[in-house]
């Protein structure tokens, strides 16, 4: 036996593809249209957005905590624009109640048709051995018939001209006309006589209560129903439920397993929508407001939770998560036609906390539904807190600054030793001499004689030395300087 809880839960998962093996596979389209785009389940407390798309109230509110657009069309959405769809919720509830019955009926009819096609034409005529087995079976119900019918049966069996199939059909039709079906027969609560419900309610009950004799018409009807007594004798005794027992059959077995679990008398979706209009709105209960956690101190947040009779222990992130989740549960519950009590909502909140990593693992920094956390907010948000961001990433910034300073020092030492040197081969191709070349060589020698910058020197001294070297290097590499030098040497 598999004890995996996920396997057990999968057995209760419904999907539009369940209709494919039935006689009406196109019903999967109706099934899928009644499901939420986010959770893929049947719509619960459906709400419609300003862009005319419908989702579960819980799903879309949870989605809009982090996002600000419609999941389908990406149009901008606000939680305040969500509207209830009362009729759609009742339609979905009604369909989900009858869904298992429809599936079973369609599959059952399909299997019966396949069975009828595979049956041979001679399978309807039972053999003598089968007849004897059926007669000797203890579960087989025996129906006694009148002497006239038995004589006609013997005569028909004596003659071989009439086939058995025809005889069987005649007997079945006669017995059906003579004896009402079991569902049509009821028992008188006074004299315990079995008869039809119409006869009991119109004539028999009055005579039975007054103690008078039954009229001839009712007697004849009662005599025809007395043939049902043999069936009753072979059935187990049942307790008499009183006068209300004749409003329903004594033995009312469900047609299918799914129908036995469903009380069809409680499918009052139509009554709720048309008659119980006062239950459509919950004006006396206000929805919870959305909090701006960046402007709330921890004591203030705990005060808000305490006012809602919610736990106040935990870290700051846990407190924010707790409020957000209860905010979603509470407001989506008000969108339902059949809201739950606050006690049930708090039980759901407790179950959510037990399954959430931010509450089960200490020190976890999960940011699910945490719109107050800087990790969730965008840097372009008007409520973005720079101080919180700096505090959360202070250590990372320090390491980046340290690495940047080290790379600057390495780059400065390389520039002093290598990038200041000038390619002398290009200048020597020209017959350059004289005083300007000596001055140029002095600039180069002065640049090469400068010692590397000490690591312990201050940044101001380093910047001054580097700027002086760059200035001299620019003069030495200046094309005007080289041009003047060449002109003077040629002259």
From Swiss-Prot:
RING-type zinc finger segments: 36-74
Compositional bias segments (type: Low complexity): 143-161, 213-229
SUPFAM superfamilies cross-referenced by the UniProt entry: RING/U-box
Pathway named in the protein's UniProt entry: Protein modification; protein ubiquitination
UniProt-listed Enzyme Commission number(s): 2.3.2.27
Locations listed in the record: Nucleus
Comp. bias intervals (Basic and acidic residues): 126-138
Zinc finger (UBZ4-type) stretch: 185-213
GO cellular component terms, A-Z: nucleus; Rad6-Rad18 complex
Residues covered by the SAP domain: 293-327
Catalytic activity, as annotated: S-ubiquitinyl-[E2 ubiquitin-conjugating enzyme]-L-cysteine + [acceptor protein]-L-lysine = [E2 ubiquitin-conjugating enzyme]-L-cysteine + N(6)-ubiquitinyl-[acceptor protein]-L-lysine
Binding-site residues for Zn(2+), renumbered to this chain: 188, 191, 204, 208
EC class name: transferase
Alphabetic keyword roster: DNA damage, DNA repair, DNA-binding, Metal-binding, Nucleus, Transferase, Ubl conjugation pathway, Zinc, Zinc-finger
Any single biological process term in GO: postreplication repair
Superkingdom of this protein's organism: Eukaryota
Gene3D superfamilies for the chain: Zinc/RING finger domain, C3HC4 (zinc finger)
Region feature Disordered, mapped onto this chain: 116-161, 211-249
Main subcellular location: nucleus
GO molecular function: single-stranded DNA binding; ubiquitin protein ligase activity; zinc ion binding
Quaternary structure, from the entry: Interacts with E2 UBC2, forming a complex with ubiquitin ligase activity.
Family affiliation: Belongs to the RAD18 family.
Function per UniProt: E3 RING-finger protein, member of the UBC2/RAD6 epistasis group. Associates to the E2 ubiquitin conjugating enzyme UBC2/RAD6 to form the UBC2-RAD18 ubiquitin ligase complex involved in postreplicative repair (PRR) of damaged DNA.
Protein's recorded name: Postreplication repair E3 ubiquitin-protein ligase RAD18
Annotated gene: RAD18
């Amino acid at each position: 036996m598999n004890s995996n809880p996920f396997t057990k839960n999968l057995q209760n998962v419904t999907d539009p593809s369940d209709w494919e093996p039935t006689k009406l596979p196109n019903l999967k389209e109706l099934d899928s249209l009644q499901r939420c785009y986010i959770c893929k389940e049947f719509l619960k407390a459906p709400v419609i957005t300003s862009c005319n798309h419908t989702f579960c109230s819980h799903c879309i509110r949870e989605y809009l905590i982090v996002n600000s657009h419609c999941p389908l069309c990406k149009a901008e959405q606000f939680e305040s624009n969500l509207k209830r769809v009362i009729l759609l919720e009742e339609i979905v509830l009604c369909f989900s109640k009858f869904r298992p019955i429809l599936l079973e009926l369609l599959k059952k009819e399909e299997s019966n048709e396949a069975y009828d096609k595979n049956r041979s034409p001679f399978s309807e005529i039972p053999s003598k051995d089968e007849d004897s087995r059926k007669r000797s079976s203890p579960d087989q119900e025996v129906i006694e018939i009148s002497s006239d019918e038995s004589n006609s049966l013997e005569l028909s069996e004596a003659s071989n001209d009439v086939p058995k199939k025809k005889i069987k059909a005649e007997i079945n039709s006669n017995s059906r006309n003579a004896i009402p079906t079991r569902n049509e027969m009821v028992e008188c609560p006074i004299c315990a006589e079995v008869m039809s419900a119409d006869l009991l309610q119109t004539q028999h009950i009055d005579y039975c209560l007054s103690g008078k004799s039954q009229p001839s018409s009712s007697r004849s009807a009662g005599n025809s129903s007395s043939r049902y007594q043999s069936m009753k004798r072979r059935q187990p005794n049942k307790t008499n439920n009183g006068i209300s027992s004749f409003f329903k059959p004594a033995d009312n077995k469900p047609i299918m397993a799914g129908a036995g679990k469903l009380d069809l008398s409680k499918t009052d979706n139509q009554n709720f929508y048309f008659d119980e209009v006062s239950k459509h709105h919950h004006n006396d209960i206000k929805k919870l407001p959305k909090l701006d956690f960046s402007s709330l101190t921890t004591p203030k947040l705990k005060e808000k939770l305490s006012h809602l009779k919610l736990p106040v222990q935990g870290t700051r992130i846990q407190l924010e998560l707790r409020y957000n989740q209860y905010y979603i549960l509470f407001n989506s519950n008000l969108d339902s036609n059949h809201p739950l009590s606050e006690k049930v909502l708090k039980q759901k909140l407790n179950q959510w906390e037990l399954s959430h990593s931010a509450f089960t693992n200490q020190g976890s920094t999960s940011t699910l539904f945490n719109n107050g956390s800087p990790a969730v907010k965008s840097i372009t948000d008007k409520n973005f807190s720079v101080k919180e961001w700096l505090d959360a990433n202070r250590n990372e910034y320090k390491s980046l600054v340290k690495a940047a300073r080290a790379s600057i020092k390495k780059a400065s030492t390389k520039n002093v030793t290598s990038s200041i040197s000038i390619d002398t081969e290009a200048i020597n191709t020209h017959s350059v001499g004289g005083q300007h070349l000596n001055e140029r060589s002095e600039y180069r020698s002065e640049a090469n004689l400068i010692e590397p910058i000490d690591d312990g020197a201050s940044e101001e001294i380093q910047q001054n030395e580097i700027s002086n070297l760059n200035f001299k290097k620019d003069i030495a590499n200046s094309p005007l300087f080289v041009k003047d030098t060449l002109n003077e040497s040629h002259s």
